[in-house]
Regions:
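Secondary-structure boundary/capping residues
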Residues: 15-19, 87, 98, 131, ...
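Helix-loop-helix units of permease transmembrane domains in multi-pass membrane transporters
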Residues: 78-107
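Short, charge-rich amphipathic segments
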Residues: 24, 55, 82-93, 133-140
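Alpha-helical transmembrane segments of multi-pass membrane proteins
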Residues: 7, 11-19, 98-115
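Secretory targeting signals
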Residues: 28-39, 43-70, 77, 102-166
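Hydrophobic alpha-helical transmembrane segments
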Residues: 1-63, 76, 80-81, 162, ...
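Short, well-structured alpha-helical interface segments that form or flank functional binding sites
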Residues: 1, 84-85, 155
Length: 223
């Protein structure tokens, strides 16, 4: 049953996942080409100068892609269940409800993590050729809040889709926008170093909101 659930979720989300992965790879490649062009024309030293003096990590075009992937996967996964009224049937399958929801969320989370890891690896592999380890670390830490925001957006999107009460949908949406906006509020590189671990833990706890929406749906708390 578990394999069937995972396969079903993969079928629903693979299109969004592959598009998001392709877009991330393309944007990472674009940033690498930008760095390579600057290095070819003005030398690697100029890249270091830009990164240290102007706080330009050459990853700006990647800022909102993980967020879009998180929202897209959440919609692709949960919206068809609700629009086609399949979710109630899903909850009545001969399998633990909590494990089923966990499996569904695990698939979405794995896809978001995969996009984040692939993007990071592409950037890091190139940067390690021309930058000091300290600068490479700075680039990764600058991107990390964007990946956390993707996880937060995914869980909130899933929770909003499942929630059956309009007022609760609006409240969850506003809360989600507020939390995600907070993760993009810092303009400087490594702006969230001191609280990054806290945000990672908080992002995973957002999965509880999905369970809350599932419980309310099962109890018939809908408009």
């Amino acid at each position: 049953m578990l394999k069937a659930i995972i396969y079903k979720e993969w079928l629903k989300t693979r299109g969004v996942f592959l598009i998001g992965l392709l877009l991330s790879v393309c944007m990472a490649g674009f940033e690498i080409l930008s760095m390579n062009r600057v290095g070819t024309v003005k030398g690697v030293e100029h890249i270091w100068q830009i990164m240290l003096m102007k706080d330009n990590m050459f990853v700006n075009h990647l800022t909102f892609i993980p967020l879009a992937v998180g929202v897209g996967v959440g919609l692709a996964q949960m919206l068809p269940e609700m629009v086609q009224k399949r979710f109630k049937l899903t909850l009545h399958l001969p399998y633990s409800q909590n494990r089923m929801v966990l499996a569904m969320l695990a698939v979405g989370l794995a896809e978001i993590v995969a996009v984040s890891v692939v993007t990071s690896v592409i950037v890091v592999v190139y940067d390690m050729r021309i930058l000091a380890p300290e600068l490479v670390s700075r680039v990764v830490l600058t991107m990390s809040p964007w990946f956390v925001a993707a996880v937060v957006a995914y869980f909130f999107t899933a929770a909003v889709c499942i929630e059956g009460c309009r007022v609760q949908k609006v409240a969850l949406s506003l809360l989600g926008v507020g939390v995600v906006s907070w993760l993009f509020a810092g303009d400087a590189p490594e702006a969230y170093n001191g609280v990054l671990l806290l945000f990672v833990v908080a992002s995973l706890l957002c999965a509880l909101l999905v369970y809350r929406s599932v419980y309310r749906f099962k109890e018939g708390l809908q408009d």
